């Protein structure tokens, strides 16, 4: 999701960047981007996880529920019952 956000942001910057009189597109874009923004910083922000995500994972991993497993989808994890167990059978076939 963060990657899509950055791609969309950079596309908007390229489209809406004001060009100075006789200037190049890069000079207009450089005026909109902070000086400390480097490719390394951008990649680090895309790869690293937020502190709240790490804390949430720690609490989820330490509190298991009976007959449930940890179901993770796109960095959001919840405890859910096993999908192949039907509740109406009560353990009988």
Swiss-Prot record:
Belongs to the conotoxin C superfamily. Consomatin family. One of its GO terms (cellular component) is extracellular region. GO terms for molecular function: toxin activity. The keyword Repressor does not apply. It comes from Conus geographus. Moderately activates human somatostatin receptors (SSTR) with a preferential activation of SSTR1 and SSTR4. In vivo, does not cause behavioral changes in mice within a few minutes of intracranial injection, but causes a progressive loss of movement thereafter. Four to five hours after injection, mice recover, even with the highest dose tested. Shows antinociception and antihyperalgesia activities in two mouse models of acute pain, most probably by acting outside the central nervous system. Residues 19-69, 79-93 form a propeptide. Keywords: D-amino acid, Disulfide bond, G-protein coupled receptor impairing toxin, Secreted, Signal, Toxin. Its main location: secreted. Residues 1-18 form the signal peptide. This is Consomatin G2. The cysteine framework is C-C. The keyword Signal applies. It is found in: Secreted. Expressed by the venom duct. Disulfide bonds join 72-77. This peptide is an evolutionarily optimized stable analog of somatostatin. In addition, it adopts nearly identical conformations as in the somatostatin drug analog Octreotide. As this drug, it contains a D-Trp at the same position, whose synthesis is a common strategy used for enhancing the metabolic stability of compounds in drug design. Consomatins evolved by gene duplication of a 'Somatostatin and related peptides (SSRP)' gene expressed in the snail neuroendocrine system. It comes from the Eukaryota. The modification D-tryptophan is found at residue 74.
